[in-house]
Every structure is written in structure tokens, then in C-alpha cells.
Design a protein with these regions (language model features):
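Primarily recognizes the serine-hydrolase "nucleophile elbow" in alpha/beta-hydrolase
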Residues: 67-111
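Extracytoplasmic/secreted cell-surface and envelope-processing proteins
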Residues: 11-13, 39-42, 78, 104-107, ...
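Soluble non-cytosolic domains of exported or imported proteins
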Residues: 42-49, 86, 123-127, 185-190
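Active-site machinery of serine-nucleophile hydrolases
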Residues: 4-60, 152-162, 166-169
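Gly/Ser-rich "nucleophile elbow"/oxyanion-hole loop immediately N-terminal to the catalytic nucleophile
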Residues: 41-76, 86-91
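C-terminal catalytic histidine-bearing segment of alpha/beta-hydrolase fold enzymes
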Residues: 114-116, 127-130, 139-203
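The conserved beta1-alpha1 loop
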Residues: 2-6, 117-118
Length: 203
């Protein structure tokens, strides 16, 4: 599982924060790439090629099934993962984006997508997450109107997608008034666990 950090941070710090290996529990490699600058290239090929190189290096060094590479991105890393899923779906089996918007893109190919977003996020507005899920539903040939799939986590799923693709959107409505405002821009641990469970169900 490739896990892409937001801007002005790095893979090591992101690992200390998100600790996705705690949710994977030894079932997969968790990798936290570093961007080459303060942010990712979310419109061009620079970081798409970089991701391909990372996957090549990992499969040469370890026993990794290239047909089961997943990508998770948070914030600006989420923008990259949207871009990766759109332009290079051959590299990943499925993608998940937390609190990350998606610039309008064309020429995307279908693949399974999970989008999660905090209701209280003021950095990346919840509507942007919903819009990203709707765009992927269009790419994947799904229905326009989603149906509730997991009420406890605020999840809805778009039906009728081109097999084997799916699109799920989960809105995290949790609010703690004691939290600093910036803490509302995150993927809470409960939704990190949900993300790994979702990856495990991808056909």
C-alpha cells in the first residue's frame, strides 16, 4: 500500500502520524514515499513516473504482487492519488483519498475508488470530496444517485458501476469541540481502519 502525504511534509513524518501498518497488521507492505519538493505534481507525469519507479524498486526487492498495489492519499497527496488513478490505473488495483479534492481531468479509466472526507474540514471542503466521488462515478459508469451502504460511517455507494469497479463516499461527521481547528483536516483512525478493510474487499 502506497501512502502519500500532504504538502510541506514527508513520508517519515506522515508514517509517524498515520501508522497505517497498525491497521494492515502484517498483511501488506506499507510504503510512504517522499515528494521531491514541498508538494506533488498533480497535473503532469513527474510523480506518476516516480510512482512507477517506486513500484518497480519494491517488486525487485521484495515478493510483491503487482496486481495488488493500492494507493492511499491524504490532502494534497489525495490529489496525486486521484491523478494517479485517472492516468495510470495500470499501476494500482484501487485508490482511496481522504480530504483531498480533484481537479477536473479527462481521459480517465475506471477503477475502484473510495473517498472519505471530514464534515468539519475547512481546508478541503466536504463538497469537494463529494464532487470527486461523483466524478469517479461518472468515469466508472455508475448511477448518479448513491445509496446508503454503511450508516455508522456515513458511507454511500454508487451502484451499477462497470465491473469490477466501485465508488464509495464516506463522510466523517465526528466533531470534538476541544480539538484545534486544524485537527479537523485529517483521516481519523477509525477511517484509516475502514480504508484498509475496503481495500481488502476490492475484487
Amino acid at each position: 500500500m502506497l501512502t502519500f502525504h500532504g504538502w510541506y511534509t514527508n513520508g517519515r513524518d506522515f508514517q509517524k502520524w498515520f501508522k497505517m501498518e497498525d491497521h494492515v497488521e502484517g498483511a501488506a507492505f506499507t510504503v510512504y514515499p517522499d515528494s521531491k519538493g514541498p508538494t506533488w505534481d498533480v497535473v503532469g507525469n513527474t510523480d506518476l513516473d516516480f510512482t512507477a519507479d517506486v513500484i518497480d524498486a519494491l517488486t525487485n526487492a521484495y515478493c510483491i504482487d503487482r496486481t495488488h498495489v493500492f494507493a492511499l492519499g491524504f490532502s494534497y497527496g489525495g490529489k496525486l492519488v486521484h491523478h494517479l488513478g485517472c492516468k495510470r490505473p495500470d499501476l494500482v488495483r484501487a485508490i482511496s483519498v481522504g480530504d483531498g479534492s480533484w481537479q477536473e481531468e479527462t481521459g480517465c479509466r475506471p477503477l475502484p475508488v473510495l473517498v472519505t472526507h471530514r464534515t468539519r474540514d475547512d481546508d478541503e471542503l466536504p463538497a469537494w470530496g463529494r464532487n470527486a466521488a461523483q466524478r469517479w462515478a461518472k468515469v466508472n459508469g455508475c448511477s448518479d444517485v448513491p445509496e446508503e451502504s454503511d450508516a455508522a460511517h456515513g458511507c454511500v455507494a454508487y451502484r451499477g458501476c462497470k465491473a469490477p469497479t466501485t465508488v464509495t463516499f464516506c463522510e466523517d461527521r465526528h466533531f470534538d469541540p476541544t480539538w484545534p481547528k486544524e485537527w479537523n483536516h485529517t483521516i481519523r483512525e477509525e477511517y484509516r481502519s475502514l480504508t484498509w478493510s475496503w481495500f481488502n474487499r476490492v475484487p
